[in-house]
Swiss-Prot record:
Active site: 253
InterPro entries: IF-2B-related (IPR000649), IF-M1Pi (IPR005251), IF_2B-like_C (IPR042529), Initiation_fac_2B_a/b/d (IPR011559), M1Pi_N (IPR027363), NagB/RpiA_transferase-like (IPR037171)
Entry-linked HAMAP family: Salvage_MtnA
Protein's organism: Drosophila grimshawi
GO terms for MF: S-methyl-5-thioribose-1-phosphate isomerase activity
Reactions this protein catalyses: 5-(methylsulfanyl)-alpha-D-ribose 1-phosphate = 5-(methylsulfanyl)-D-ribulose 1-phosphate
Protein name: Methylthioribose-1-phosphate isomerase
Length: 363
């Protein structure tokens, strides 16, 4: 059974504090937008899909007990608070896209004379809550599409179409139930391979400096009893040389229109090594992680985190006092290194991504 990182019922929101994992499992109440901003910014909740869901639901929790005299005041509250939430972690595009959708909805409802203030509030709450269920459904579709793509590629490479043997895969950072509403994106692909009986082994990187792989992905894999091994970030090249890894599958915080992908720091170097060893490299991401307004990775804003995340583990200093640090939270993997981008609507080559997504948006 997958872990539950988000607990929600109308008027109440709790998140599993991921800074305490894997030692302590503790849920934190999120009573409104200020709490939502803080848990996102402090990375007590993380993963682009989860950030968007928690951010939007924190506003739903805040608005639920409030009374608004006019639709205009409700619209202004929604717009102002959502724009504030976007600032908590700007690299992850999902929060911005979700905020824009909800702001558009609020504007449309406020202009509709047939909609009362109470109706407008109700429909806003319904829309935010629908995001939770949609994310889980999208993740399951991503898992199915990704597993199929990997198995088909392996079968083709081994000359045995339709009958691929169980595979070994590598994943980076955390993209499972803890990073989404449930099931996961890249880890959802791993889960689906397991459900098909086609997962021989999954390797997860520690993912320094925040150790999301060691603390969170390993926690999920052990919880679900999947065959898994933790490796250091610096071991990936050696792993590819000796362990016959069939594919790499990672998540994404933002995918540009040309397929360039911003993801957790360390993703780029894994893609370079995968290319050298001929290992297919897949990005698993919902459409909400794809930003067609960004032409390439050069235009993606990369969040830089505090030095302390590198110099300390918990309260213990591990680096020499006085040393300078450079701590970007993400890097950008060029589209040329990406085999395919796995979405809930299929697997697309980076070169055709923009046109394929544009077609889907038109439907």
């Amino acid at each position: 059974m997958s872990l539950q990182s988000i607990k929600y019922k109308r008027g109440s929101l709790e998140i599993l504090d991921q800074l305490l994992l894997p030692v302590v499992s503790k849920y934190l109440p999120v009573r409104g937008v200020e709490d939502g901003w803080k848990v996102i910014n402090k990375m007590q909740v993380r993963g682009a899909p989860a950030i968007a869901i928690v951010g939007c639901l924190s506003l739903a929790v805040e608005i639920y007990p409030e009374e608004f005299e006019t639709k205009k005041s409700l619209r202004q509250e929604i717009e102002g608070k959502l724009n504030y939430l976007v600032s908590a972690r700007p690299t992850a595009v999902n929060m911005k896209i979700s905020a824009d959708e909800l702001i558009t909805l609020a504007n449309e409802l406020s202009k509709n004379d047939d909609v009362t203030v109470a109706n407008m509030k109700q429909r806003f709450l319904d829309a935010t809550e629908a995001m939770l269920e949609k994310d889980i459904a999208d993740n399951r579709a991503i898992g199915s599409n990704g597993a199929k793509a990997i198995l088909e590629r392996v079968a083709e490479a081994t000359g045995s179409p339709g009958s691929a043997s169980p595979v070994r895969v590598l994943t980076h950072c955390n993209t499972g139930s803890l990073a989404t509403a449930g099931y996961g994106t890249a880890l959802g692909v791993v889960r689906h391979l397991s459900e098909l009986g086609k997962l021989e082994h999954v390797y997860c990187t520690e993912t320094r400096p925040y150790n999301q792989g060691a603390r969170l992905t390993a926690y999920e894999l052990v919880h679900e009893k999947l065959p898994a091994t933790l490796v250091l970030d610096s071991m990936v090249a050696a792993l590819f040389r000796v362990k016959n890894v069939a594919a790499v599958v990672v998540g994404a915080d933002r995918v540009a229109a040309n397929g360039d992908t911003a993801n957790k720091i360390g993703t780029y170097q894994i893609a370079v090594v995968a290319k050298h060893h001929g290992v297919p490299f897949y990005v698993a991401a919902p459409l909400t992680s794809i930003d067609l307004q960004i032409p390439s990775g050069e235009h993606i804003i990369i969040e830089v985190r505090p030095d302390r995340e590198m110099t300390h583990v918990g309260e213990h200093r591990i680096a020499a006092p006085g040393i300078n640090c450079w701590n970007p939270a993400f890097d950008v993997t060029p589209a040329s290194l990406i085999t395919g981008i796995i979405t809930e609507h299929g697997v697309f080559k980076p070169s055709t991504l923009k046109d394929e997504i544009a077609k889907l948006i038109e439907l």
